[in-house]
């Protein structure tokens, strides 16, 4: 995912005793008067041909698609190379994400967590499973979803997961978030579209690079603190004594309406605990600050620098190609961003307002245009296949945003969708192309055939795959050295978690019905 996320867990851990008011109208925004009134998360790298940076958000694409300016969609269509944080259509990505969540050596959470904490967690998950049928919407049921399947898709095999992933899972098992299940998140949708359009796709990060900071680095007390605080918050919400401060609806509104200075972007949806209304004693505030500092460095600054360098490498490898980089919007906002890295290296990167024409020379090997979608650029105008976007408040993302703005890692919903959609593809046809984990000299690969299911309002919707693999990392040494059966690693950052059903859930009609078949 991060899902995704410069200060998510970070600022979240430090947020104490302060209930923040919720925006009144969720994801609703006023219709704009014209394209120029839309918010834009598109940046252009000035070169010949140009390259583009696009800020995504890890929420159902149908909630934001109509608010994405036509020139952003045109830039995507004009590109011949599309890169994401992770390769969302590669079976190895899915299997590695699934396995990195597992405790090593067949360990179980009951063996690792303190007795009381384990049973509190189990009681909460039992409650969620009981409530799941009432949380689901008629539309979800009409699309073939059922409660047990949905619960297993998110929380299956939870007792085998590392505490950090369980913490993220708990934060995705809320009524509001459950109601969003069934539609691919924007990142995944773009990956599916790129595959459908036969574009060359790839990634700038390896699965291990997203997993490692979560599975390693925190000591036993920090792990206990983060998981315990997460459960306390969810138990308070459940008891009615606390209202969730920021929800997916709020994040969608801020993305669509361009309120980028809002602190909500520090919390990339409710996947990350805020610990609001929790009075932390001084020693626990120190623990929170230590966790904040660690993840700020590992999940924000180091990732941005690494991603920026790999963007530059890909640009050098594809000097005559139009490249499109789709990362979490937070990677382009705040301090020490990917854009800062590129500018420091001498590249000219400009924000591209909505309504501004995209000037791109026609690609030498244009990708096939799916269902009448135009891929020819050269002043590229809004693509015919892209619906007229309803509106939103005009706001260009400022370059000097709050340093706590969070780059998105893949969130729990994002990853569970990857697995579910992948299980509906005959990915074994491509298995032979993934005999070895791809190294980073293979920064882009050709995506092959895919099946599609066209959703009503939008152009196309391809699919992706999944599989299983051995855990790439061992449990943090600090945790293994603990006397009591302590929890495995638990940070509270913004990485998403892949449901454990990688090896337990059978093929079923899609969890997310608008997704590919």
From Swiss-Prot:
Keywords: Cell membrane, Glycoprotein, Hydrolase, Membrane, Metal-binding, Metalloprotease, Protease, Signal, Transmembrane, Transmembrane helix, Wnt signaling pathway. Residues 424-437 have a biased composition (Basic residues). This is Metalloprotease TIKI2. It is an enzyme of class 3 (hydrolase). Pfam families: TraB_PrgY_gumN. It comes from Homo sapiens (Human). It is a single-pass type I membrane protein. GO terms for biological process: negative regulation of Wnt signaling pathway; positive regulation of protein-containing complex assembly; proteolysis; Wnt signaling pathway. It comes from the Eukaryota. Was named TIKI in reference to large-headed humanoid in Polynesian mythology. Belongs to the TIKI family. GO terms for cellular component: nucleoplasm; organelle membrane; plasma membrane. Its cofactor is Mn(2+); Co(2+).
């Amino acid at each position: 995912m991060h899902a995704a996320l410069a200060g998510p867990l970070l600022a979240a851990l430090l947020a104490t005793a302060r209930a923040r008011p919720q925006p009144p109208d969720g994801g609703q925004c006023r219709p704009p008067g014209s394209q120029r009134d839309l918010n834009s998360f598109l940046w252009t790298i000035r070169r010949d041909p140009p390259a583009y940076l696009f800020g995504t958000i890890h929420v159902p694409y149908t909630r934001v698609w109509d608010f994405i300016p036509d020139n952003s969609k045109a830039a995507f269509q004009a590109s011949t190379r599309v890169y994401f944080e992770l390769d969302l259509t590669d079976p190895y990505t899915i299997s590695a994400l699934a396995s990195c969540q597992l405790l090593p050596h067949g360990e179980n959470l009951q063996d690792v967590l303190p007795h009381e904490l384990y049973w509190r967690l189990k009681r909460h998950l039992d409650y969620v499973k009981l409530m799941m049928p009432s949380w689901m919407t008629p539309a979800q049921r009409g699309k073939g979803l059922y409660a047990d399947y949905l619960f297993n898709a998110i929380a299956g095999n939870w007792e085998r997961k590392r505490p950090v992933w369980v913490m993220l899972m708990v934060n995705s098992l809320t009524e509001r978030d459950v109601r969003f299940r069934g539609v691919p998140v924007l990142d995944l949708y773009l990956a599916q579209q790129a595959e459908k359009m036969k574009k060359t796709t790839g990634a700038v990060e390896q699965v291990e690079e997203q997993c490692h900071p979560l599975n390693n680095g925190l000591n036993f007390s920090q792990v206990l603190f983060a998981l315990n605080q997460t459960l306390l918050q969810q138990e308070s919400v459940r008891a009615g004594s606390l209202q969730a401060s920021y929800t997916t609806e709020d994040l969608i509104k801020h993305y669509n309406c361009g309120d980028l200075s809002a602190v909500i972007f520090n919390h990339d949806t409710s996947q990350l605990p805020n610990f609001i209304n929790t009075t932390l004693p001084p020693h626990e505030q120190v623990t929170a600050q230590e966790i904040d500092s660690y993840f700020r460095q590992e999940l924000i600054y180091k990732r941005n620098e690494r991603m920026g360098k790999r963007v530059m490498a890909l640009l050098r490898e594809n000097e005559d190609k139009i490249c499109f980089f789709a990362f979490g919007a937070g990677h382009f906002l705040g301090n020490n961003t990917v854009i800062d890295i590129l500018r420091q290296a001498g590249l000219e990167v400009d924000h591209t307002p909505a309504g501004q024409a995209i000037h791109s020379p026609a690609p030498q090997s244009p990708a096939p245009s799916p269902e009448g979608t135009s891929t020819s650029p050269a002043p590229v105008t809004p693509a015919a296949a892209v619906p007229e976007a309803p509106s939103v408040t005009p706001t260009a993302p400022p370059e000097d945003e709050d340093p706590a703005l969070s780059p998105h890692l893949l969130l729990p919903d994002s990853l569970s969708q990857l697995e579910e959609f992948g299980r509906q593809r005959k990915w074994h046809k491509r298995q032979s192309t993934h005999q070895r984990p791809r190294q980073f000299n293979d920064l882009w690969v050709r995506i092959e055939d895919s099946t599609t299911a066209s959703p009503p309002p939008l152009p196309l919707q391809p699919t992706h795959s999944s599989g299983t693999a051995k855990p790439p990392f061992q449990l943090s040494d600090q945790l293994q050295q603990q006397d009591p059966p302590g929890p495995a690693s638990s940070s509270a950052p913004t990485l998403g978690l892949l449901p454990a059903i990688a090896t337990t859930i059978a093929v079923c009609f899609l969890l997310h019905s608008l997704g590919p078949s």
